């Protein structure tokens, strides 16, 4: 262990970490496969399809059904409150900044479309299943729980 005037190696590293300035917000500009958001928004759909992942390319190359077409119309238009049951629409750069409410099977979950979501499905950002929270055993689950008082 090397000890010098400033202290041990560990304390020197700790001081160096603390002295670094913490940056707030986004440290670097958003880019998707080397393209900025502005460049992506200026691209035609054919150019954009070439840089998207295979699953998104395949989905966009096929014709959309009626529900998907209606949702895309709303997303590209000037609608304020967009509620939908359609979860299988690929997020495109023109949708960035829109606020969408997607149905999860029970209620609508509201979120804003961010640049990092490009190329993903709408349904990926709304969970359909609740997180399991285990508690004590139910009535009749064990022999001793038969005699537990109900709430």
UniProtKB/Swiss-Prot annotation:
Q: An example of a Gene Ontology BP annotation on this entry?
A: ribosomal small subunit assembly
Asked if Chloroplast is a keyword of the record, the answer is no
Q: Where are the transmembrane segments?
A: none
Q: Does the keyword RNA-binding apply?
A: yes
Domain of life assignment:
Archaea
Gene Ontology cellular component list? cytosolic small ribosomal subunit
Tell me the GO molecular function terms: rRNA binding; structural constituent of ribosome
Q: What InterPro entries would the database entry show?
A: Ribosomal_uS19, Ribosomal_uS19_CS, Ribosomal_uS19_euk/arc, Ribosomal_uS19_SF
For this protein, the record's Gene3D superfamilies field holds: 30s Ribosomal Protein S19, Chain A
Compositional bias annotation for Basic residues: 11-23
Keywords, alphabetical? Ribonucleoprotein, Ribosomal protein, RNA-binding, rRNA-binding
Positions of region (Disordered): 1-23
What is the documented function of this protein? Protein S19 forms a complex with S13 that binds strongly to the 16S ribosomal RNA.
Q: Give the similarity note.
A: Belongs to the universal ribosomal protein uS19 family.
Listed name of the protein: Small ribosomal subunit protein uS19
Q: What is the organism of origin for this protein?
A: Thermoplasma volcanium (strain ATCC 51530 / DSM 4299 / JCM 9571 / NBRC 15438 / GSS1)
């Amino acid at each position: 262990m090397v000890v010098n005037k400033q202290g041990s190696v560990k304390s020197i590293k700790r001081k160096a970490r603390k002295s670094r300035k913490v940056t707030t917000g986004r440290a670097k500009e958003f880019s998707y496969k080397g393209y900025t958001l502005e460049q992506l928004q200026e691209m035609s759909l054919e150019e954009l399809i070439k840089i998207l992942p295979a699953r998104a390319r395949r989905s966009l190359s096929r014709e959309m059904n009626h529900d998907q077409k209606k949702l895309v119309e709303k997303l590209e238009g000037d609608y304020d409150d967009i509620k939908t049951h359609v979860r299988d629409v690929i997020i495109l750069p023109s949708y960035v900044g829109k606020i969408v409410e997607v149905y999860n099977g029970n209620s609508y979950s509201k979120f804003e479309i961010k640049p990092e979501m490009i190329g993903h499905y709408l349904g990926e950002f709304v969970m359909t299943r609740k997180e399991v929270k285990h508690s004590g055993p139910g009535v009749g689950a064990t022999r001793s729980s038969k005699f537990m008082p109900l709430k």
